[in-house]
Swiss-Prot record:
Its main location: cytoplasm. Pathway: Amino-acid degradation; L-arginine degradation via ADI pathway; carbamoyl phosphate from L-arginine: step 1/2. Its EC number is 3.5.3.6. GO terms for biological process: arginine catabolic process to ornithine; arginine deiminase pathway. Keywords: Arginine metabolism, Cytoplasm, Hydrolase. It is found in: Cytoplasm. The active site is at C400 (amidino-cysteine intermediate). This is Arginine deiminase. It catalyses: L-arginine + H2O = L-citrulline + NH4(+). It is an enzyme of class 3 (hydrolase). The gene is arcA. One of its GO terms (cellular component) is cytoplasm. PANTHER family: ARGININE DEIMINASE.
Length: 410
């Protein structure tokens, strides 16, 4: 394997992808803690698993190798000291409940096999799982209704966000919300210690220790020379600027970064919830991210005279900026919901714009977004629909649920 990670476009034939099958973490959601854990509803586990399995099999049927985050993470932690280090970091970053000794929780987690350990960390540790010593301190006697020593990680099935493949390397991301911060730790250990990746010296363009947040749902690889990144509710302009500087100084293929400003709200969480590439010259878009005349704030970042200086050009037309960086005379923006104010809002809420391209002009979408799917077909796109009644409750679509590891060049 020459490069274990290789992604130079959004639409090149997908060869290898990383998924996470929803597990116990979804069942550990309760109404009282939905907002804290970034959910609006509680998926029904048996059905969301069936839908996710259908999604994975749909990809396999098209020749895609499907990897699972939970399996790779377990395979990476073969060394005893490595397991202990990983658990220590998970507990520290998860701010595991201070009323239980760190060591007690650590010993409990390390008593499991690797596979069970990963599932337990992802699923969360309930307070009634661990026998603690007799309560002798006042703080221990205080009634505490919070049910977890270690919070569940229900957003993990959105593998797109904690890390993103960019060329032959990747970003391992600092997530904005505390509920998701630990997620990128899995990818850090997989890249460093899993035999599939560890011997290849995979470049890390930006790591999770950088102080400003960036998330993979905002990172779109337009072509070998250009990436687009959303300035969003979850991704900071400062992180984009740092990533651009790192890319320009450490490699010579990517020459432009488009910073696309989108409204900062939950409905438009990441750039890929409102804008995705479906063919060489076709994109889906949610019309509400544009002003009355189609105006937006787009900044084209290019290498400056030195490593710490960027050339920044402002544009107010997404169409014109895309045509410039892609070298196209014409392109098509396909509106989510057909531009109808009700259909577009409804289908965008259920990720109508969040398509996963598995080849040029071939996309995977949620079946429930029938207006958008019909419009895509009318524009010559092959649309492969997957079941979505429970998957969509997490507010993420097929692109959100997948991290491409290898794509063919276009």
């Amino acid at each position: 394997m020459k490069h274990p990670i290789h992604v130079t476009s959004e639409i090149g034939e997908l060869q290898t992808v990383l998924l996470k099958r929803p597990g116990k973490e979804v069942e550990n959601l309760t109404p009282d803690y939905l907002q804290q854990l970034l959910f609006d509803d509680i998926p029904y586990l048996p059905i969301i698993q069936k839908e996710h399995d259908y999604f994975a099999q749909t990809l396999r049927n098209r020749g895609v190798e499907v990897l699972y985050l939970e399996k790779l993470a377990a395979e990476a932690l073969v060394d005893k000291k490595l397991r202990e280090e990983f658990v220590d970091r998970i507990l520290k970053e998860g701010q595991a409940d201070v009323n239980v000794a760190h060591q007690t929780l650590k010993e409990y987690l390390l008593s499991f096999s690797n596979e069970e350990l990963i599932q337990k960390i992802m699923g969360g540790v309930r307070k009634n799982e661990i026998e603690t010593s007799k309560k002798t301190h006042l703080y221990e006697l205080m009634e505490d209704h919070y049910p977890f020593y270690l919070d569940p990680m229900p957003n993990l099935y959105f593998t797109r966000d904690p890390a993103a493949s960019v060329g032959d390397g990747l970003t391992i991301n600092k997530m904005r919300e505390p509920a998701r911060r630990r997620e990128s730790l899995f990818m850090e250990y997989i890249i460093k210690y899993h035999p599939r990746f560890s011997s290849h010296n995979v470049p890390i363009w930006l790591d999770r220790d950088y102080k400003f947040p960036i998330e993979g749902g905002d990172e779109l690889i337009l072509n070998e020379e250009t990436i687009a990144i959303g300035v969003s509710a979850r991704t900071s302009a400062k992180a984009i600027e740092r990533l651009a500087k790192n890319l320009f100084s450490r490699q010579n293929k990517i020459k432009k970064v488009l910073a696309i400003e989108i409204p900062k709200c939950r409905a438009f969480m990441h750039l890929d919830t409102v804008f995705t590439m479906v063919d060489y010259d076709k994109f889906t878009i949610h019309p509400a991210i544009q002003g009355p005349k189609g105006n937006m704030n787009i900044y084209i970042l290019e290498k400056g005279p030195d490593e710490e200086t960027l050339k920044i050009t402002h544009s107010t037309s997404l169409m014109e900026a895309l045509k410039e960086v892609l070298g196209l005379s014409e392109l098509v923006l396909i509106p989510c919901g057909g531009g109808d104010v009700i259909a577009s809002a409804r289908e965008q809420w259920n990720d109508g714009s969040n398509t996963l391209a598995i080849a040029p002009g071939v996309v995977v979408t949620y079946d429930r977004n029938y207006v958008s799917n019909t419009l895509l077909r009318e524009h010559g796109i092959e649309v492969i629909e997957v079941l979505s009644s429970e998957l969509s409750r997490g507010r993420g679509g097929p692109r959100c649920m997948s991290m491409p590891i290898v794509r063919k060049d276009i």
